[in-house]
Regions:
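Conserved glycine-rich Rossmann-like NAD(P)H-binding loop of the short-chain dehydrogenase/reductase
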Residues: 32-47
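Active-site helix of classical SDR
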Residues: 120, 156
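Conserved glycine-rich cofactor-binding loop
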Residues: 16-17
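The beta1-alpha1 cofactor-binding region of Rossmann-like NAD(H)/NADP(H)-dependent oxidoreductases
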Residues: 60-70, 102
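Residue(s) in the substrate-gating loop at a strand-loop-helix junction
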Residues: 140
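C-terminal helical subdomain
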Residues: 179-180, 199-244
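Substrate-binding pocket helix/loop in short-chain dehydrogenase/reductase
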Residues: 96-97, 101-106
Length: 244
């Protein structure tokens, strides 16, 4: 725990599993109070119970602005506003480019890109009102390179990277913007791939390669604990054995 993190309030989207849940644990251990946002309310309620009095669970879908506004009101009332926002909610619906995948494409754009933008728009005033803070956007190694079957997913992450750099310039010095670009991580992302052959191949690829969600959470905790005079703008974290 450090003076820069003790008592601060962190809002984490997609907090029901994977990187989101691991980040909640890491930030709580560093002295943050945490607001856990996700659709699977049973999971975040269990996690809030595990973390104790400084944690609240709020059912919210990042594609639903009204739900986000209600969540922000609860954070303000119960925790005193937001100091750190972690835009973690996302889906990775890989597959060959085809009209059969158009619902997946729309969902990725709405969750990965527009969801992060809307969440930030809703919570940014609280961060400013609290004297500034940290905005953490979870991107991907796919935000640096595109490959077959990940085109639209990569497009959403390239979008996150470009938008984040614009925000960094616009919001400094009061709000620090950090982009985290994970490589293969052992999460539930592959569970939701609808293209059967792609799902099987992706799961096989990450099975023995993936790093743990806690590895990314540790990086996030490190970034937000840095002295205010500095910002870690972009952090690429890959398994040591990941080729690209």
């Amino acid at each position: 725990m450090s003076d820069t993190t003790h008592g601060r309030v962190a809002v984490i989207t997609g907090a029901s599993s994977g990187i989101g849940a691991a980040t909640a644990r890491a930030l709580a251990a560093d002295g943050h109070r945490v607001a856990l946002l996700a659709r699977r309310v049973d999971r975040i309620e269990a996690l809030a119970g595990e973390l104790g009095d400084g944690a609240i669970a709020i059912e919210a879908d990042v594609t639903d602005r009204e739900a986000l506004v209600a969540a922000a009101q609860r954070v303000q009332q119960e925790l005193g506003g937001t100091d750190v926002l972690v835009n973690n909610a996302g889906v990775m619906l890989l597959g060959p480019f085809s009209s059969e995948q158009r619902a997946d494409y729309r969902q990725m754009v709405e969750v990965n890109l527009l969801g992060a933008i809307t969440t930030t728009e809703v919570f940014l005033d609280q961060i400013r009102a609290n004297g500034g803070g940290d905005l953490i956007n979870i991107s991907s190694v796919a935000g640096r390179t595109a490959r077959p079957i990940n085109g639209v997913y990569a497009a959403t992450k390239w979008g996150i990277n470009g938008w984040s750099e614009s925000l960094r310039q616009e919001l400094q010095p009061d709000v620090r913007v950090t982009v985290i670009e994970p490589g293969a991580v052992g999460t539930e992302l592959t569970d939701h791939i609808t293209h059967a052959a792609t799902k099987e191949a992706t799961e096989e690829y990450v099975k023995d390669l993936a790093i743990r969600p806690e590895d990314i959470a540790d990086v996030i905790a490190f970034a937000v604990s840095r002295p205010r005079r500095m910002t870690l703008n972009e952090i690429l974290v890959r398994p040591t054995a990941q080729p690209s």
